[in-house]
């Protein structure tokens, strides 16, 4: 029995070492190509969204989904109803969802062990340098589309893939608490629009002195 345990730990150590030593660049490039290529990634864009908080796909009795109109400019600006939301981890979530982190020169990548998420085999990619704390992205092994993000105390599942202007994007995100595994936020994108420039009338935070 002791020999079996030792062998198991040895195999695990070997797998971890192989994952950490693998070159992540091909996986990063394939993930970008899977959604349409670098030129199709979003930089300035508008989202129309519907969302609610709770543990069920439908809002609790007496509650309704919230509507939101957002404008984002990667990497760090996000306006809701023309007001910039300021420092917020959600900006990094959006950069992961849009794969903007994969083209950030500050990003450092590392292959991490594969997982199985809801029956789907996923390959893992850890991102540091451009985001704190580190993010773990999991790409569907067959499609190489982003399926799951593990970050901070949550994990995110992305689904309902759609296509717009040559770009494939996940229109649905469900966020779960890592500790309990229970969902707490449901989000759907109802409209996506690529913008050539920021529209007029947006609030611009004053630079700190």
Predicted features along the sequence, with ranges:
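A short, amphipathic edge element
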Residues: 45-47, 100-113, 152-156
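Gly/Pro-enriched, hydrophobic low-complexity segments
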Residues: 121-207
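Hydrophobic h-region of N-terminal signal peptides that target proteins for export
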Residues: 10-19
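An acidic-aromatic
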Residues: 56-100
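Sec-dependent signal peptide recognition
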Residues: 2-11
């Amino acid at each position: 029995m002791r020999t079996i345990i030792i062998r198991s730990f040895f195999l695990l150590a070997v797998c971890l070492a192989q994952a950490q030593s693998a070159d992540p660049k091909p996986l990063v490039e394939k993930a970008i190509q899977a959604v349409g290529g670098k030129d199709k990634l979003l930089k300035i864009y508008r989202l129309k969204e519907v969302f609610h908080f709770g543990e069920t796909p439908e809002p609790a009795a007496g509650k309704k989904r919230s509507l939101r109109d957002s404008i984002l400019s990667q990497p760090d600006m996000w306006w809701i109803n023309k007001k910039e939301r300021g420092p917020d981890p959600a900006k990094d979530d959006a950069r992961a969802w849009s794969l903007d982190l994969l083209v950030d020169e500050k990003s450092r990548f590392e292959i991490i062990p594969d997982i199985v998420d809801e029956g789907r085999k996923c390959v893992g990619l850890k991102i540091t340098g451009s985001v704190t704390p580190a993010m773990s992205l999991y790409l569907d092994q067959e499609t190489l589309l982003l399926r799951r993000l593990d970050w901070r105390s949550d994990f995110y599942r992305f689904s309902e893939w759609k296509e717009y202007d040559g770009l494939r994007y996940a229109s649905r995100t469900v966020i779960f608490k890592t500790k309990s595994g229970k969902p707490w936020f449901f989000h759907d994108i109802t409209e996506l629009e690529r913008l050539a420039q920021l529209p007029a009338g947006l609030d611009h935070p004053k630079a700190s002195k």
